[in-house]
Amino acid sequence: MNYFPWLTIIVILPIFAGSLIFFLPHRGNRVIRWYTIFICIFELLLTAYTFCYHFQTDDPLIQLMEDYKWIQLFDFHWRLGIDGLSIGPILLTGFITTLATLAAWPVTRDSRLFNFLMLAMYSAQIGLFSSRDLLLFFIMWELELIPVYLLLSMWGGKKRLYSATKFILYTAGGSIFLLMGVLGIGLYGSNEPTLNFETSANQSYPLPLEIIFYIGFFIAFAVKLPIIPLHTWLPDTHGEAHYSTCMLLAGILLKMGAYGLVRINMELLSHAHSIFSPWLLIVGTIQIIYAASTSLGQRNLKKRIAYSSVSHMGFIIIGIGSITDTGLNGALLQIISHGFIGAALFFLAGTTYDRIRLVYLDEMGGIAILMPKIFTIFSTFSMASLALPGMSGFVAELIVFFGIITSQKYLLMPKILITFVMAIGMILTPIYSLSMSRQMFYGYKFFNIPNSYFFDSGPRELFLSISLFLPVLGIGMYPDFIFSLSVDKVEVILSNSFSK
């Protein structure tokens, strides 16, 4: 038991500090912006300090455990803890949120509320990744939806209310299944509700009941990940949201679904997972092909990037379904890798829109000469998205491939077939990615417009882009840093789960 509440401070600090925004003096938006960025940077540094000095990477058990009785009547505890599975997403959350608040610098309308919602979202996401109690997990899952809905409905495009309503209907519908699963596991087999992750992991269920629990949790996480056919909220949401909100959606929100699949479906419901894992491979493979093909037909720039995100999530599903150390490590690496690449692409799409006020690719063209810095950065991240060797996406997708090939669970012919179809998906990725760059940056549509109408990337945008690019390059060159966090925990999940 940890005696100093590091994790509680890390979870509560952003929303508590965010609530103080409303009491700041009325001296313009600059004070609010700097205050929010200071809180994000301080939170990120505090998180990094805590993990550096109080977390042992070679220990697969839960560390920094905190357990406080919260509601006596339900035996509900404020129970936090981290392990190799959660430390990566928590650091990713801090990094992307800090950059998203910097990206939101131009937002001036209701900036107090906007920045408070960003910080409230920060708290909910870190709370979800560090929770060790099923009901606390559900509360953080729900708490995170409210800021996203408000950010969508108040700071978005012309169809923002439609996309916000669609988002909340999909995610709230999925949350019903999550709540049913949480209550089912909590109330099963004892007079006292047992919501502790450790107790639930050691609990055995009748197979039909475990399958029902698995399907309930799977639907909830499939909406958030998203998994086809529950993905249609994502392109509409990304198409209308402000690009700083898109950075949080692509960088962190989608990863919550993947984290839930590993943390609950794989760790707590291992027998059902071994039954459904072949179906995960099939769904993941179809998703890679379908989303890549659909992305190619999108006229809207942000919707094309959104479908590319759906395609890349297919690799995470396949890695989770492979039931191998290699495949699961590859899926966790893809979670981190796509967090940076997806956030960067949406940021660049948003800054481009700020300049040319166009969202349809067939109306663009010839921007490369007018904005060479944005062209260079966008092209670089497009290469990272299509898994260029030396970038993080290449390592993640390659390791997922190896995970499928080395899996002992599947016969040779299905493995060859799935690998072949995945390879087709990887061929489609450069087609839609390079086509997007060609339509935006080449051609003559903007060639004859005087340069005074446009300005290239400024210092703030360059700093943001470089900050997102360095981790992509660093992970691509040295992925062992990420693996060192998760490899022991992955071994424990697979050995405990599938030897029961």
Curated annotation (Swiss-Prot):
It is an enzyme of class 7 (translocase). It is found in: Plastid, Chloroplast thylakoid membrane. It is a multi-pass membrane protein. Keywords: Chloroplast, Membrane, NAD, NADP, Plastid, Plastoquinone, Quinone, Thylakoid, Translocase, Transmembrane, Transmembrane helix. It comes from the Eukaryota. InterPro entries: NADH_Q_OxRdtase_chain4, NADH_Q_OxRdtase_chainM/4, NADH_UbQ_OxRdtase, ND/Mrp_TM. GO terms for molecular function: NADH dehydrogenase (ubiquinone) activity; ubiquinone binding. The chain crosses the membrane at residues 4-24, 35-55, 87-107, 113-130, 134-154, 167-187, 211-231, 242-262, 272-292, 305-325, 330-350, 364-384, 386-406, 416-436, 463-483. Its EC number is 7.1.1.-. GO terms for biological process: ATP synthesis coupled electron transport; electron transport coupled proton transport. GO terms for cellular component: chloroplast thylakoid membrane. The keyword Plastid applies. It holds the Pfam family Proton_antipo_M. It catalyses: a plastoquinone + NADH + (n+1) H(+)(in) = a plastoquinol + NAD(+) + n H(+)(out); a plastoquinone + NADPH + (n+1) H(+)(in) = a plastoquinol + NADP(+) + n H(+)(out). The keyword Chloroplast applies. HAMAP family: NDH1_NuoM. Belongs to the complex I subunit 4 family. NCBIfam families: NDH_I_M. This is NAD(P)H-quinone oxidoreductase chain 4, chloroplastic. The gene is ndhD.
